[in-house]
Amino acid sequence: MNRLFVVNKPIFRTSNGYMGYVKRKYNTKKVGFSGTLDPFATGCLIVATGQYTKLFQYLNKTPKSYKATLWLGANSPSLDIEKVDSIREVAPFSQKTIEEVLQSFKGELTYYPPRFSAKKVNGKRAYELAREGKEIDLKQITSTIYEITLINYNHPFIHFEATVSEGTYIRSLGALIADRLRVDATLSSLHRIHEGQFHYENEKALDPFTHLAIPSNIYTGDEAYLELGKKLSVDYFEAKENGIYLIETSNFFSIIEIVGEAVKYRFNRIPKFEDTP
């Protein structure tokens, strides 16, 4: 079965662990997902089965939008509610101050990922090293905060919405907001609203052809060459410039790359979408 869809990940389930439920529900063995959500987070998680699992890197998955709640006065080494180790009372802020602080993060943001994250350090996940109490040398990353808006401030909880580039850690954004306010704080809730074009629609099957972030090209040669995976000539493509392209045939679609005079297959003979239950 080849299927692309969005699940609404429940709270306190790992993204990887939730795939076990998806496998059983759809009676399939090959399942993958894109854009890991933390266990405490909920919301949009892109899932694919069968050959569609090869397509994640080509999907239109950015920008991403989140709703989050920042709990002022709470401290957690994981920057979320899973490891809260202290709670202190802090004085309320004016709504104007909160809004100004949030707006100050719009644009490019360079920061360190959370210690409890899936980032790899010398072949191991950062969260594995953090749990072992080991020192972690994480490199800074740069994200773009396209929009950040205050939804509600009900002390000690700041509810905000952020639209960000792919790979942004909202837990780190929450920690930076807390630093700017000069208080301890941690995220108490996080919900992903959408990833690019993808949002939750009761696990509706999606046509991957309309969700790929690569340009289409037209192959004017014999389709049998594509079907058999034979060597292709750049002369038979409408666009001949270097790049990665989507090629549609009557029965399937392929992803190819043109490099100079060479044509390379990225993925070939990917079954077309069939709108079946």
Swiss-Prot record:
It is an enzyme of class 5 (isomerase). It comes from Sulfurovum sp. (strain NBC37-1). HAMAP family: TruB_bact. Responsible for synthesis of pseudouridine from uracil-55 in the psi GC loop of transfer RNAs. This is tRNA pseudouridine synthase B. GO terms for biological process: mRNA pseudouridine synthesis; tRNA pseudouridine synthesis. Its EC number is 5.4.99.25. It comes from the Bacteria. The keyword Secreted does not apply. Gene3D superfamilies: Pseudouridine synthase. It holds the Pfam family TruB_N. The keyword Nucleotidyltransferase does not apply.
